[in-house]
């Protein structure tokens, strides 16, 4: 769900950059030192999974994994998503630098929605609600990222 360069107005770009910067800063503050390797591994998975495109009609689709990142990392998903999108912009020209904030905000807010919905349904217990919570969390991440895009 990369937004192309030149499509959005300056106020939208600035708002997206502010939301992304706040999310990245708060995510860096919230991440625990023992989760750095997990965040790096999940960031690499997010980066690679989004490069595998499946043709569908005249377009294509790819895995997003922002819901998974949100459920596992919580707020730390924001900086992970930012780094992955930055690398995609630098290496493959997906998205761009001016829309990096908006792309990070839409993906990061979707990840946070998945985090909130998953833990609201599943709570702290490990029972049958986990399957429903996982589905709802992942579905909401894609839905909210799509709506925000």
Protein language model regions, located:
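Hydrophobic transmembrane alpha-helices
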Residues: 2-68
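Short helix-perturbing small/polar motifs within transmembrane alpha-helices
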Residues: 104-149
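Membrane-helix interfacial "entry" motifs
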Residues: 2-6, 31, 35, 63, ...
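Aromatic-anchored segments of alpha-helical transmembrane domains
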Residues: 45-51, 86-92, 142-148
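Interfacial aromatic-anchored transmembrane helix boundaries in multi-pass membrane proteins
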Residues: 51-59, 83-114
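Hydrophobic alpha-helical transmembrane segments
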Residues: 9, 13-14, 36-41, 47-57, 64, 77-86, 118-132, ...
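Alpha-helix C-terminal capping segments
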Residues: 69-76
């Amino acid at each position: 769900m990369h937004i192309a360069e030149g499509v959005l107005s300056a106020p939208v770009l600035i708002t997206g950059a502010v939301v992304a910067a706040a999310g990245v800063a708060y995510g860096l503050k919230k991440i625990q030192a023992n989760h750095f390797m997990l965040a790096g591994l999940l960031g690499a998975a997010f980066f690679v999974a989004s490069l595998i495109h499946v043709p569908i009609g005249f377009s294509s689709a790819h895995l997003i994994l922002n819901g998974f990142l949100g459920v596992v990392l919580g707020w730390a998903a924001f900086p992970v998503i930012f780094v992955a999108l930055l690398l995609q912009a630098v290496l493959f020209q997906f998205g761009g630098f001016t829309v990096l904030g908006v792309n990070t905000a839409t993906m990061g807010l979707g990840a946070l929605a998945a985090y909130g919905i998953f833990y609201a349904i599943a709570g702290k217990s490990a029972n049958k609600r986990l399957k429903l919570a996982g589905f709802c969390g992942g579905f909401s991440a894609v839905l909210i990222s799509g709506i925000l895009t």
